[in-house]
Amino acid sequence: MNAAALEAEDPSRAGQSPLRWWILAGVWLIYMCFGLTASSLAPLVAPIIRDLGLTHTEMGSVLGAWQLAFIVSAIPCGMLVDRLRPRRALLVGAFLIALSGVARSFATDYFTLFLAAALFGVGGPIVSTGAPKVVSQWFTGNERGLAMGIYISGPFAGGVVTLVTTNAVMMPLFEQNWRAVLLAWAGLAALSGLIWLVVSSRPEARQKEANLASATKVPTTTEIATLLRLRPVQILLVMAVCIFMINHGFSNWLPEILRSGRMDAVTAGYYAAFPTIVAVIGSIVIPRYAVPARRVMMLALLATSAGAGTLLLFIDTGPLLVLGLFLQGVSRGAMMTLAMLLLIELPAVGDKRVGTASGLFFAFAEVGGVGGPLTLGLLYDLTHSFTAGLLMLAGFAAIILVCLWALRPYLKAPPTASLEHR
């Protein structure tokens, strides 16, 4: 069945179904709980280190544990999404995220906390690879960029909730019991799965998924190898590592970086939430204007913003610190979105390989997701300062600029002329 036949049989494929916005809202809610759970440990670093007797290096490895599991599971989960279909897959992902939150709340030492955090790395990639597949199914043309920006704002919104409310609201509410706070976040994740079940069970959604499943082929390991041989895919995967190195290193340690400048925990939480709020807005607004002809230029500006924002964190207080946090928020909110758009719109990817291509993207990206938090923690233990870690993150922003320079010829060339690795 070709695309034209699908549109004739399924009007929502042409972007005409009102249900697509409810579907997008359901995806956003799950992805918001993804971000909420991913960032839930960062504001609780101090009490967790104290109660469980951890070093900063051990805590850094815990913060990177789920990304480590993500690396191993992202590609299989991407293939699972293509095989199982995203409606069911996202439900499974939501409940695995909730289970990780519950397990964290019962951790008794470094090992159990590490395993609980790593469990998130099994549910997380199902959501990360399933979400772009849902968007590619329900949205086309200019709406696709908007929809991508909206759903990717979800994790940042979840980060805002945890950073703003953990020490200011939740910890006092639960009598400074960090375990109860983590359990509450797990309950929200489970609720998001139930809401998705209701929204995605509509007959129209079931029919659309059945139509698309009959028209697409389940990817194989051979197709993964084919994607990995494409030069633009290789470049984008290197960029993914750098983007996540910056995003995860920055977001996981930002409250502690600010506290090292003599801020109290509540004030640091408010300051740390500021770039996340900016990221929510940026992830929605910027992709709307990132038409294909502008994407490389806009990504270059965002990488420059990330590097400059990181360097400005050397200033403890004042307007320049706020500017640095703002620049970090702008870049964090949109870099991944634009890189994902470049990847899934490559001719060699197409709708049938979105899940697998997304799995590849996140499998490589989470190398940076692990390396960022772990390396910052290690460098702090070695130097008793975050200076070396911040300089490292600025260096990865520079690498993104080099990758964009290398990517440009392949985006300008005809699809069949220069995609293959030569």
Question: Which residue ranges define each predicted feature?
Answer:
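Flexible cytoplasmic inter-helical loops of multi-pass small-molecule transporters
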Residues: 198-222, 414-420
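Residue-level signature of mid-helix packing/kink "hotspots" within the transmembrane helices
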Residues: 39, 67-75, 159-160, 276-284, ...
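C-terminal transmembrane helical hairpin of 12-TM major facilitator-type secondary transporters
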Residues: 293-342
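Conserved MFS/SLC helix-loop-helix module at the cytosolic interface between two early adjacent transmembrane helices
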Residues: 72-110
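Extracytoplasmic gate region of multi-pass secondary transporters
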Residues: 41-42, 231-283
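Cytoplasmic helix-loop-helix junction between adjacent transmembrane helices
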Residues: 116-154
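Helix-loop-helix hairpin linking two adjacent transmembrane segments in secondary transporters
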Residues: 150-201
